Amino acid sequence: MREYDIVVIGSGPGGQKAAIASAKLGKSVAIVERGRMLGGVCVNTGTIPSKTLREAVLYLTGMNQRELYGASYRVKDRITPADLLARTQHVIGKEVDVVRNQLMRNRVDLIVGHGRFIDPHTILVEDQARREKTTVTGDYIIIATGTRPARPSGVEFDEERVLDSDGILDLKSLPSSMVVVGAGVIGIEYASMFAALGTKVTVVEKRDNMLDFCDPEVVEALKFHLRDLAVTFRFGEEVTAVDVGSAGTVTTLASGKQIPAETVMYSAGRQGQTDHLDLHNAGLEVQGRGRIFVDDRFQTKVDHIYAVGDVIGFPALAATSMEQGRLAAYHAFGEPTDGITELQPIGIYSIPEVSYVGATEVELTKSSIPYEVGVARYRELARGQIAGDSYGMLKLLVSTEDLKLLGVHIFGTSATEMVHIGQAVMGCGGSVEYLVDAVFNYPTFSEAYKNAALDVMNKMRALNQFRR
């Protein structure tokens, strides 16, 4: 039996950062991970491969250059899965090496196999490939096992015609048509990628809209752009059956509509990977969809056991998981922290990108907080013309009482990079006046901040003149 100060189950973003943070504090650390999943879902089947796939799609289709060279422009006429996955596998390999090297450098013991609780302090790790069993104990334990795609009962997934977001990375050929069930972040990201590749995509969503946590104006802009790529939306519809035949699939909706397509991809949420952990032996149980409940310090109801990352639910982002892992380790060992910041940017890697930080107009209106809006259009930026992005936009929400920046919403090229400027200003309690006075490199997309800041200040100046 091996004894450690802390044992981390799962090597994704949350688990990795928890392990390294603990090691930096001088603690003995073990991390448990399944055989070929070092780096977790993030590196192997989630964030890294999907975002790399997106980059490959943008490059090979020439999507970003069509504004300049015409709608028919492509870097390669016939794009195959091999073209797309070559880049993906290369990046995954590099990321796995990075994770392994970081663990080795910080003297974190990597124990390969499936871990499950024997008692609240003891984990049995079974490596079925090597037929080995290892028992480890930890004064503290952090669960960071992540999630897997949820699969509705009654739907047969054959990994060829009917698949989920994991299986989509193993397609043998690019489908000419596809039904995407679910208009959440993952569904919309993949819908936009395949639409860019020329696949005829239909998105089916049982709610009346999509991405309802985002700014409505930004969502409408994204929907318009996706429709321009021939994406069809079926909102307020529910799938009742998926029939598979030699020619493809037929998706039947509750309304009676039938949609023929070569492939169906389900993006119906995520399921916590907790069913193999034997949590009852640790005095724990799960909530809906296999999630583990924690407090604001990421402690479970068993004080020495923490949980971080997707397995605890919203926001289920790699970036927030990393911070949760670090903070959980710090709390376990009595290291002072300020807690997790409320300013957490959201990034959606659709084509085009969407990103925001802070409040939305809906939230401010519900809270009766007076604000003004400043907007900058990419088509008015020299960088937008150079890059061929005439559709992008940046929106600032500014308090009319003290000029503080309340929210930043971006749609278009580099949105997920650009959002951090607004995040930094908000985090420092800065006002829109800082952006008015700031000097930005020219030509850049970052200039949009100054343009939007000037726009909102001009609106407020006009209002003040009207009051006189």
Curated annotation (Swiss-Prot):
<dbReference type="GO" id="GO:0004148">
    <property type="term" value="F:dihydrolipoyl dehydrogenase (NADH) activity"/>
</dbReference>
<dbReference type="GO" id="GO:0005829">
    <property type="term" value="C:cytosol"/>
</dbReference>
<keyword id="KW-0274">FAD</keyword>
<dbReference type="Pfam" id="PF07992">
    <property type="entry name" value="Pyr_redox_2"/>
</dbReference>
<protein>
    <recommendedName>
        <fullName>Probable soluble pyridine nucleotide transhydrogenase</fullName>
        <ecNumber>1.6.1.1</ecNumber>
    </recommendedName>
</protein>
<dbReference type="GO" id="GO:0003957">
    <property type="term" value="F:NAD(P)+ transhydrogenase (Si-specific) activity"/>
</dbReference>
<dbReference type="InterPro" id="IPR001100">
    <property type="entry name" value="Pyr_nuc-diS_OxRdtase"/>
</dbReference>
<dbReference type="InterPro" id="IPR036188">
    <property type="entry name" value="FAD/NAD-bd_sf"/>
</dbReference>
<dbReference type="InterPro" id="IPR022962">
    <property type="entry name" value="STH_gammaproteobact"/>
</dbReference>
<keyword id="KW-0963">Cytoplasm</keyword>
<dbReference type="InterPro" id="IPR016156">
    <property type="entry name" value="FAD/NAD-linked_Rdtase_dimer_sf"/>
</dbReference>
<dbReference type="GO" id="GO:0050660">
    <property type="term" value="F:flavin adenine dinucleotide binding"/>
</dbReference>
<dbReference type="GO" id="GO:0006103">
    <property type="term" value="P:2-oxoglutarate metabolic process"/>
</dbReference>
<dbReference type="InterPro" id="IPR050151">
    <property type="entry name" value="Class-I_Pyr_Nuc-Dis_Oxidored"/>
</dbReference>
<dbReference type="Pfam" id="PF02852">
    <property type="entry name" value="Pyr_redox_dim"/>
</dbReference>
<comment type="function">
    <text>Conversion of NADPH, generated by peripheral catabolic pathways, to NADH, which can enter the respiratory chain for energy generation.</text>
</comment>
<dbReference type="GO" id="GO:0005886">
    <property type="term" value="C:plasma membrane"/>
</dbReference>
<dbReference type="InterPro" id="IPR023753">
    <property type="entry name" value="FAD/NAD-binding_dom"/>
</dbReference>
<keyword id="KW-0560">Oxidoreductase</keyword>
<dbReference type="InterPro" id="IPR004099">
    <property type="entry name" value="Pyr_nucl-diS_OxRdtase_dimer"/>
</dbReference>
<feature type="binding site">
    <location>
        <begin position="33"/>
        <end position="42"/>
    </location>
    <ligand>
        <name>FAD</name>
    </ligand>
</feature>
<keyword id="KW-0520">NAD</keyword>
<dbReference type="GO" id="GO:0006090">
    <property type="term" value="P:pyruvate metabolic process"/>
</dbReference>
<keyword id="KW-0521">NADP</keyword>
<keyword id="KW-0285">Flavoprotein</keyword>
<dbReference type="GO" id="GO:0009274">
    <property type="term" value="C:peptidoglycan-based cell wall"/>
</dbReference>
<dbReference type="GO" id="GO:0006739">
    <property type="term" value="P:NADP metabolic process"/>
</dbReference>
<comment type="similarity">
    <text>Belongs to the class-I pyridine nucleotide-disulfide oxidoreductase family.</text>
</comment>
